[in-house]
Amino acid sequence: MNAVTSANNNTDNRRLRLDVVSIFPEYLDPLRHALLGKAIEDGYLEVGVHDLRDWATGGHKAVDDTPYGGGPGMVMKPEVWGPALDDVAAGRVAGWELESATPHRNVARHDELAGVDKHAYEGEDADLPLLLVPTPAGKPFTQADAQAWSNENHIVFACGRYEGIDQRVIEDARNRYRVREVSIGDYVLIGGEVAVLVIAEAVVRLIPGVLGNRRSHEEDSFSDGLLEGPSYTKPRTWRGLDVPEVLFSGNHARVDRWRRDQALLRTQRVRPELLDAVELTTEDRKVLGLD
């Protein structure tokens, strides 16, 4: 990869370190493109990618073995994963540092958003790095998780393959990490790398300063518990379809109310269960036909 040099626009010196351990490190190349690449370039993000096979021994560098108790597939070995996570937690391995894929114009950024506290369960040391293990058996990943994790200093991803990682690795890792097993949906992927790309993008875009306009994520789907409503741009009429007139009214209160109504109606139609956690006003209830 070609090195990219640019001015550092991160004036508050706040930086998130991501380390990813995988048997397919090349799969993580998208982490250096687009918004994440810009975050690397501007000094908000550092990414290290580590090949799990670097900790494997023997001629074949095997990282998996047959499961105890029988059954299909292979399980990833603890004697490979354990040392890998030990070294990454301690910073004893340099890894493959991702550089921004494309140079950008150096435009100063300003953002007033305050971070949120690190998330730690009772009895956990909040100063330990956060270990995320993508697995369909994990807790569903949410926007609230992304917001909380955007305030972390160091996140490590352990990408499983085959039938997953020996569970003892997860249990042992709690001595050095705050561990979260997390799922990005009710489906099964070939490995954890895709989930890493999803989670990393959701988290990094919420770091103050990464997005140029704070409203870009304040008005996201799920930021207020609702799905985001429709968006429109030029031309005003396209293939016989018109942009709603209210958007040309110049009345910000009317526009905000319309957007709220559209978000409510879309949520009711697509994800009605989300409304249970939303504090609805009298006007909201009228829009939804609940009064």
From Swiss-Prot:
Its EC number is: 2.1.1.228
Q: What class of enzyme is it?
A: transferase
Query: Signal peptide position in this chain?
Result: none
Its chief place of residence is cytoplasm
Biological process GO annotation list?
Answer: tRNA N1-guanine methylation
**Which keywords, in A-to-Z order, does the entry hold?**
Cytoplasm, Methyltransferase, S-adenosyl-L-methionine, Transferase, tRNA processing
Say what the protein does: Specifically methylates guanosine-37 in various tRNAs.
Family, as annotated: Belongs to the RNA methyltransferase TrmD family.
What is this protein called in UniProt?
tRNA (guanine-N(1)-)-methyltransferase
